[in-house]
UniProtKB/Swiss-Prot annotation:
This is Toluene efflux pump membrane transporter TtgH. Keywords: Cell inner membrane, Cell membrane, Membrane, Plasmid, Transmembrane, Transmembrane helix, Transport. One of its GO terms (cellular component) is plasma membrane. It comes from Pseudomonas putida (strain DOT-T1E). It is a multi-pass membrane protein. It is found in: Cell inner membrane. Pfam families: ACR_tran. The chain crosses the membrane at residues 10-30, 339-359, 366-386, 392-412, 440-460, 470-490, 542-562, 871-891, 895-915, 927-947, 973-993, 1008-1028.
Length: 1049
C-alpha cells in the first residue's frame, strides 16, 4: 500500500486534505459540552399536599408510590423526601445506558397505578414527573432597578411570561422558581365567620359554585328545524378576574333576606401563590428561575437558547426590569475547552522543538508535525459515529494522542534518514526500502498501544463513560496515525526530504554539533552501564524486585478518589437558623452573608444571590441558600484566590455567627453529579428501630465524625427535629356534639393550611384561588379557640370543645432511601486526605453505631465505590491484553515477558509524581497510568525487537545483541519519550478551569515516562537476556526429561 502512495504523492495529499475537510465540517456541527452524560439518568416525581406534615406526606403519599415502583428496567436506587410544607420528591436513579425517555415513561406508568390510592387533595394538585439532574445549570433573575416591583411582582412576571417558554426549550429538564405567581387569596376572619354561623368550607363551596366557567351552547345549533336563519354562541357565566368580584360572592342568604358575602367574613386579595421563598440579588429584591438540565441535554446549546429567548422577551418586560444570570455554569465549560485547545497548540510546539533537536533538520521535523492536524481533524470526523462529542475528556485524549501519533511518523522519517545516511540512497529509494522494513512494526506497535486502551471501553458506570471517551478517542487517533504513517508520511518523505550532503549528524557545527558530541559521550557511558548490568544480573534483578515491591507499597499509599476537585468559578453557602426560627431571623443571617461577600470578597465576586426559605437540605423559614459566581480565572490567578481558599476563609468567618449554621461549599467536578464535593451517604434504619433511634444514631455519627481528623464539614443534609403542635381530636366528644370528623379536618386544613378551591383568570392566564385564615388568627396555639365548626343541628362548636393540643417533637423533613427510613449526611475529607480515606474513617465510625443502622453511599460516592471495585480488574486486563498482543506479534511467549516486566518501572514514576504533588488515585490517574503502561511497553518493544533480530537472524551473542540494540535504539527512544513528555507537560502545569483533571492525568504520565525511559533503557536488555536464557534452558531440559521417563518405563 505504501509503495502506491510513494509513487503518487499528490494522491496522498488529496486524501489528507479530504480527511481534514471532513474533520473541519464535523467540528463545526459537533455539540460542545464540558463532560459527556456521565451522571446516571434519573426521574423525579413531585407532589404537593397543602397543609400536610412531613409524616403525613410520607405515610399517605411517599410509601404508596414507592410500593408501585418495582420492576423498573435498569433500576439502580431510589430516594425520597417529604417536607412539612406538604411537598414531596421521589428521585428514581437508573443504570448508565438506560434511555431516560423510556425510564420516564416507565415511572409514569407505575405512578398511574398509585394515583387512585393518593389523597384527593394530592390528586387535585397534580403529580409532576420529569427527567432529573441534581444541580442547577443556570439561574435567570429579574431585578427591578426602579424599585416599584417587589419579589412577588417579579415572580409573577416569570411565572406568567417566561416560565412556560423557557421550560419548553430542549435541554431544560426541571426548574425551581425562587418567587411565586399571583393567586387569589381569600383571607378569613374566624370571629366574623362564627358570628354568621359559617365555616371556611362554606366559603370554599360558595366560591366553587359561583366562580365557574359555563359552556352555554348556541342559538340555532345543530340539529335544528328547517328555516332557522340564526346561529350564535351563547355566553354564560365566566370565571372571575378581580378581588372585588370575589368579595361580592354570596356565601349565605338568611331567612329575612339579608345576605352574607365574602367581604363580610374576610377579604379577597391578589397575593402570592406561595410565600415560602423570597430572593435577593445583592441588595435588590429579585425573583429567579433556577434550571436543571434534562438527562442527555446539551449544556451550551440549552443556555444559548435560554439567553436568546430572554433577549426576545426583554422588549415585553416593564421599564426598569433587568435580566441577570447570577449563577451560570457555562463559563467553566467554555474556559475548560479553551484551555485544552491552548494546551494542544502548546503541545504541538513543544513536540516540534523536541523532534527538531534530535532530527536536526527542519524538513524532517516538518513531516511528523504535518501528521498532527491530519490525524486530529480526521478524528473529529469519526468521533460522532461512536456517539462522542467535543468535551474536555475527548480533548484531553487528543493531547495524549499527540505524543503517540507523532511516534509513528518519527519512526518512518528516522528510518528513511538513516538509510539515506548509511546507504547513500535517494529519498525515493530510501522511503521504499524503509516502508518495506517497518510497515509490519508500525502496525504491531500501534496494535499494542491500542490494546492498552481497548479494555477501558468496556467498563460500565460513570467511570466507564469517562474511560470510553479516552479509549475511543485514543484508539481512533492511533488507527489514523498508522494509516497516515503508511500513506501520507512516505509521500511527504519523498517530496520534502533531501539527500544528505555529509555522512553523519556529528559533522554538524554549532549547537547541534555540541549536542551530538554530548549525546555520543552519553551513549558510550550508557553502553558501558548496560554491559555492567548484564554482568551483574543477579544484583540488578534483586534491585528490580525491590523496585517492584516498593512501587506496590507506594501505590497503596496514594489517597483514593473518584475525581479531582476543580475550581468551577462557583460556590454555594447554605444557611440554617435554629429549628422554628422565622424567615425574618433567617433574613438577618443572609444579610450578614451579603455584607461579607460585598465587603470582604467583593474584588473576586461577580454575582451573588440569596434565597430565603430554601436550601438543598429542605424548605422552611429557617433555610437559606446563597449562589455565588466568581470573576474569570484570569482575574483570580493570585494565591488564595481559588474557590477552595475563598470557601475556607468564608467558613472561618461564618463560624463566628452564633445563632445559625452557615456553611460554604464548592460544587463537585461534574456539576450534574451533586451539589457539593466530598462524600454523600445515607444512614438507614434497616431493622425498623424508629425515627428517634435513627436520629440518635445520626447524632452519634456526627459527634464521632467531628472528632475524626480525616473528616471535616460533616453535616446532615436534612433538618433537625423541632417542636410541633399536635392537635388531638376526641372522637367521642365530637360525635356527642354531632360534629363530623370531615368538617373538623376541612376547617383545620383551610384555617391553618391553605385550601385550594379552584382557578381564576388573571390577565388572560389561569391562576389559583386559595382560602386561608388571616395571619393574626393562626399565630399561637391559643388561636385554635377562635375557630368553630358547625354541627348537624346548625350550632357553632368551638375547637376547644372536642380538641386539645400539646407540643411534641417532630421532623420537618423525612427521608427514605431504597424504600427504608434514612437520613442523608454530607461531608468532606480534611485537608491532606481523600474521599477514599474519608470512607475508611466512616467505616470505622459505623462499627460504633447501634445494630440495625446501615449505610448506603449515593451520588458521586456510589460511583467512587464502583470505580474502586473496577480498578484492579482494569489493570490486570490491560496487562493481559498487552501480553497477548505481544505474543501474537512476535509468535513467542518469552519475548512478551521481557516487555511486560518494564511496566512496574513506568508505574513507579507515576506513583512518585502523584504522591509528590499530593494528588489522588482517581479516574484520570488511572487513564494516565494505562497510558504509561502502553508507552513503557513501546519503549521496551523498540529494544527487544532489535535485540531479537540481532540474536536470532544475525547470530549475535545474546548479551552483545542486547547491548547493541539498547545503544542503537537509545536516540529514537529518547526522542519519542521526550516528545510525548513535553507534549503533556502543559497539562501538568495548567491553571484555571479544568486544571485539577489536567494535573491528575499529566502528572502521572510525566513521572511515568521519566522512569520508564531512564530505567527501562537499562533494565530492558537485562530482562531480555534473563528471559531468553530462562526459556531456552527450560526448552533444553524438556527433551532430557522425556528421555529419562522413557528409559524408566
Amino acid at each position: 500500500m505504501s509503495r502506491f502512495f510513494i509513487d503518487r504523492p499528490i494522491f496522498a495529499w488529496v486524501l489528507a486534505i479530504v480527511a481534514m475537510l471532513a474533520g473541519a465540517l464535523s467540528l463545526a456541527k459537533m455539540p460542545i459540552s464540558q463532560y459527556p452524560n456521565i451522571a446516571a439518568p434519573a426521574v423525579s416525581i413531585q407532589v404537593s399536599y397543602p397543609g400536610a406534615s412531613a409524616q403525613t406526606v410520607q405515610d399517605t403519599v411517599v410509601q404508596v408510590i414507592e410500593q408501585q415502583l418495582s420492576g423498573l428496567d435498569g433500576f439502580r436506587y431510589m430516594s425520597a423526601e417529604s417536607a412539612s410544607d406538604g411537598s414531596m420528591t421521589i428521585i428514581v436513579t437508573f443504570e448508565q445506558g438506560t434511555d431516560p425517555d423510556i425510564a420516564q415513561v416507565q415511572v409514569q406508568n407505575k405512578l398511574q397505578l398509585a394515583t387512585p390510592r393518593l389523597p384527593e387533595e394530592v390528586q387535585r394538585q397534580g403529580l409532576r414527573v420529569v427527567k432529573y439532574q441534581m444541580n442547577f445549570f443556570l439561574v435567570m433573575s429579574l431585578v427591578d432597578r426602579s424599585g416599584k416591583l417587589d419579589n412577588f411582582d417579579l415572580g409573577n412576571l416569570i411565572a406568567s411570561q417566561l416560565q412556560d417558554p423557557i421550560s419548553r426549550i430542549p435541554g431544560v429538564g426541571d426548574f425551581q422558581l425562587f418567587g411565586s405567581p399571583y393567586a387569589m387569596r381569600i383571607w378569613l376572619d374566624p370571629g366574623k365567620l362564627n358570628s354568621y354561623q359559617l365555616t371556611p368550607t362554606d366559603v370554599a363551596s360558595a366560591i366553587r359554585e359561583q366562580n365557574v366557567q359555563v359552556s352555554s351552547g348556541q342559538l340555532g345549533g345543530l340539529p335544528t328545524r328547517s328555516g332557522v336563519q340564526l346561529n350564535a354562541t351563547v355566553l354564560g357565566k365566566t370565571r372571575m378576574t378581580t378581588p372585588s368580584q370575589f368579595d361580592e360572592i354570596l356565601v349565605k342568604v338568611n331567612p329575612d333576606g339579608s345576605q352574607v358575602r365574602v367581604k363580610d367574613v374576610g377579604r379577597a386579595e391578589l397575593g402570592a401563590d406561595s410565600f415560602a421563598i423570597s430572593a435577593q440579588y445583592k441588595d435588590s429584591p429579585t425573583a429567579s428561575l433556577a434550571l436543571r438540565l434534562s438527562t442527555g441535554g446539551n449544556l451550551l446549546e440549552t443556555v444559548d437558547a435560554v439567553k436568546k429567548l430572554m433577549e426576545q422577551q426583554k422588549a415585553y418586560l416593564p421599564d426598569g426590569v433587568e435580566v441577570i444570570y447570577p449563577y451560570d455554569t457555562t463559563p467553566v465549560v467554555e474556559a475548560s475547552i479553551e484551555s485544552v485547545v491552548h494546551t494542544i497548540f502548546e503541545a504541538v510546539v513543544l513536540v516540534f522543538l523536541v523532534m527538531y533537536l534530535f532530527l536536526q533538520s527542519f524538513r524532517a521535523t516538518l513531516i511528523p508535525t504535518l501528521a498532527v492536524p491530519v490525524v486530529l481533524l480526521a478524528t473529529f470526523a469519526l468521533l460522532p459515529y461512536f456517539g462522542l462529542n467535543i468535551n474536555v475528556l475527548t480533548m484531553y485524549a487528543m493531547v495524549l494522542a499527540i505524543g503517540l501519533l507523532v511516534d509513528d511518523a518519527i519512526v518512518v522519517v528516522e528510518n528513511v534518514e538513516r538509510l539515506m545516511h548509511d546507504e547513500g540512497l535517494s529519498p525515493l529509494e530510501a522511503t521504499r526500502k524503509s516502508m518495506d522494513q517497518i510497515s509490519g512494526a508500525l502496525v504491531g506497535i500501534g496494535m499494542v498501544l491500542s490494546a492498552v486502551f481497548v479494555p477501558m471501553a468496556f467498563f460500565g458506570g460513570s467511570a466507564g463513560i469517562i474511560y470510553q471517551q479516552f479509549a475511543i478517542t485514543i484508539v481512533v487517533c492511533m488507527g489514523l496515525s498508522i494509516l497516515v504513517a503508511l500513506v501520507f508520511t512516505p509521500a511527504l518523505c519523498v517530496t520534502i526530504l533531501k539527500a544528505p550532503e555529509g555522512n553523519s549528524h556529528h559533522e554538524r557545527k554549532g549547537f547541534f554539533g555540541w549536542f551530538n558530541r554530548i549525546f555520543d559521550r552519553g551513549t558510550r557511558r550508557f553502553e558501558r552501564g548496560v554491559g555492567a548490568m548484564l554482568k551483574g544480573r543477579g544484583r540488578y534483578l534483586l534491585a528490580f524486585l525491590l523496585i517492584t515491591g516498593g512501587t506496590g507499597y507506594l501505590f497503596t499509599q496514594i489517597p483514593k478518589a473518584f475525581l479531582p476537585n476543580e475550581d468551577q468559578g462557583l460556590m454555594m453557602i447554605e444557611v440554617r437558623t435554629p429549628a422554628n426560627a422565622s424567615a425574618e431571623r433567617t433574613e438577618g443571617v443572609l444579610q450578614e452573608v451579603r455584607d461579607y461577600l460585598a465587603n470582604d470578597e467583593g474584588a473576586l465576586v461577580e454575582h451573588f444571590m440569596t434565597v430565603n426559605g430554601f436550601n438543598f437540605a429542605g424548605r422552611g423559614q429557617n433555610s437559606g441558600l446563597v449562589l455565588i459566581t466568581f470573576k474569570d480565572w484570569k482575574e483570580r490567578h493570585g494565591a488564595g484566590q481559588d474557590v477552595f481558599s475563598i470557601a475556607q476563609r468564608a467558613n472561618q468567618h461564618f463560624a463566628k455567627i452564633k445563632d445559625a449554621s452557615v456553611m460554604a461549599f464548592v460544587p463537585p467536578a461534574i456539576l450534574e453529579m451533586g451539589n457539593a464535593m466530598g462524600f454523600n451517604l445515607y444512614l438507614q434504619d434497616n431493622l425498623g428501630l424508629g425515627h428517634e433511634a435513627l436520629m440518635a444514631a445520626r447524632n452519634q455519627f456526627l459527634q464521632l465524625a467531628s472528632q475524626n481528623p480525616k473528616l471535616q464539614a460533616v453535616r446532615p443534609n436534612g433538618k433537625d427535629d423541632e417542636p410541633q403542635f399536635q392537635v388531638n381530636i376526641d372522637d367521642e366528644k365530637a360525635r356527642a356534639l354531632q360534629v363530623s370528623i370531615a368538617s373538623i379536618n376541612e376547617t383545620m386544613s383551610a384555617a391553618w393550611g391553605s385550601m385550594y378551591v379552584n382557578d381564576f383568570i388573571d390577565r388572560g392566564r389561569v391562576k389559583r384561588v386559595y382560602v386561608q385564615g388571616e395571619d393574626i388568627s393562626r399565630i399561637s396555639p391559643e388561636d385554635f379557640d377562635k375557630w368553630y365548626v358547625r354541627n348537624s343541628l346548625g350550632q357553632m362548636v368551638p375547637f376547644s370543645a372536642f380538641a386539645t393540643g400539646e407540643w411534641v417533637n417532630g421532623s420537618p423533613k423525612l427521608e427514605r432511601y431504597g424504600g427504608i427510613s434514612s437520613l442523608n449526611i454530607l461531608g468532606e475529607p480534611a485537608p491532606g486526605y481523600s474521599t477514599g480515606d474519608a470512607m475508611i474513617a466512616i467505616a470505622e465510625i459505623m462499627q460504633q453505631l447501634p445494630a440495625g443502622i446501615g449505610l448506603s453511599y449515593t451520588g458521586l460516592s456510589y460511583e467512587e465505590i464502583q470505580t474502586g471495585d473496577q480498578a484492579p480488574l482494569l489493570y490486570a486486563l490491560t496487562v493481559l491484553i498487552v501480553f497477548l498482543c505481544l505474543a501474537a506479534l512476535y509468535e513467542s511467549w518469552s519475548v512478551p515477558v521481557s516487555v511486560i516486566m518494564v511496566v512496574p518501572l513506568g508505574i513507579l514514576g507515576a506513583v512518585l509524581a502523584t504522591l509528590w504533588r499530593d494528588l489522588t488515585a482517581d479516574v484520570y490517574f488511572q487513564v494516565g497510568l494505562m497510558t504509561t503502561v502502553g508507552l513503557s511497553a513501546k519503549n521496551a518493544i523498540l529494544i527487544v525487537e532489535f535485540a531479537k533480530e540481532l540474536y536470532e537472524k544475525e547470530g549475535y551473542p545474546i548479551v552483545k545483541a542486547a547491548i547493541e540494540a539498547a545503544k542503537l535504539r537509545l536516540r529514537p527512544i529518547l526522542m519519542t519519550s521526550l516528545a510525548f513528555t513535553f507534549g503533556v507537560l502543559p497539562m501538568a502545569i495548567a491553571s484555571g478551569a479544568g486544571a485539577g483533571s489536567q494535573h491528575s492525568i499529566a502528572t502521572g504520565v510525566v513521572g511515568g515516562m521519566i522512569t520508564a525511559t531512564v530505567l527501562a533503557v537499562f533494565f530492558v536488555p537485562l530482562f531480555y537476556v534473563v528471559v531468553v536464557k530462562l526459556f531456552e534452558g527450560l526448552m533444553k531440559r524438556k527433551p532430557n526429561a522425556v528421555k529419562e521417563v522413557t528409559h524408566e518405563v
